[in-house]
Amino acid sequence: MRIRSVLIAAITVIPFSLAAQNISMRPPITGIAKVSVYATDMNKSKQFYGTFLGFPQIASASASAPMEYRVSSKQSIEVQPAPNGTTDYLAYIAFATTDLDSMQRYLTSQKVPVEGDIQTQPDGTRFLWVKDPEGHRLQFVQLPPHGHLLPVSSSSVKNAPQPISQIILHAGFIVHNRAEEDRFFHDILGFVEGWQGGRGHKLEWVDMRVPDGTNWLEYMLQDPKAKNEGDSGELNHFALGVPDIHQAAQMLQHRHWDSSQPYEDPEIGLDGKWQLNLYDPNGTRAELMEFGPVRKPCCYPYTLPVPK
């Protein structure tokens, strides 16, 4: 009789345990799927992202839709009209997951507010919205099995220059409270620190790698009391990977980008990697970066293997 009672209790507990496990497990977060920026002049931004950087434009579902440029089959840059009065031109960052439904359940179980329901784009991409503790807008997206299915526009393909890059390595934004951001990105989402550094004795940058890929989010640490509106385009940024920074710079010099921002020469950053800072028409930094360091980083060693 006792054995029977134990078996019944075990059978009863198992479904509840499995249900709880399904709710609490985080699905994989594999990388950056999209970076979205605001623009005050869509035509100028089209010249920058399409003609200068060479990214083909994805065919829009409607004339009012934001412009989207394909970096690879799984990554893109979106440009949308800037809201009136905005001083921050980084609209949002989208992270890819393999199971959006499980991600929604997981976020809810962790008491992370999910904005609305899961939505689906014409190409089959599914997405949901959240905000981090400092109010940065984030998307989690589940791409179709073969990446973006929407074709690039025919006008974009014709006489298109060679894309400057085929990968978004990282994106970064201003962070005032690292502890709060770590509770969200590290404790809940599983991001892992790969490197940190800064000028002098001041910690300024922290690279937080996605848990199931090689892309990373860069905390641009700032004093909570400081006003950074004038520097937001420099701090809120994204980086494109290139195998050879000097070849990339030479390619861009032949394209004669007419920008109000000064052209910067390639330099080795404090992380030991060659980089080149470019700026779109609204001052958002589009950083070109080589994949690996050519010298020892300034301040702290890499704590994770450097992605190749």
For the regions a protein language model found, what residue spans apply to each?
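Positively charged n-region of N-terminal signal peptides that target proteins for export
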Residues: 1-5
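Vicinal oxygen chelate
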Residues: 21-27, 30-40, 67-70, 82-167, 173, 195-199, ...
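Bacterial N-terminal signal peptides
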Residues: 6-17
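Structured core of small recognition/catalytic domains
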Residues: 179-182, 186-268
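Sec-exported extracytoplasmic/periplasmic mature domains
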Residues: 50, 54, 99, 108-113, ...
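Intrinsic, low-complexity N-terminal interaction/targeting segments
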Residues: 75-77, 83, 119, 215-219, ...
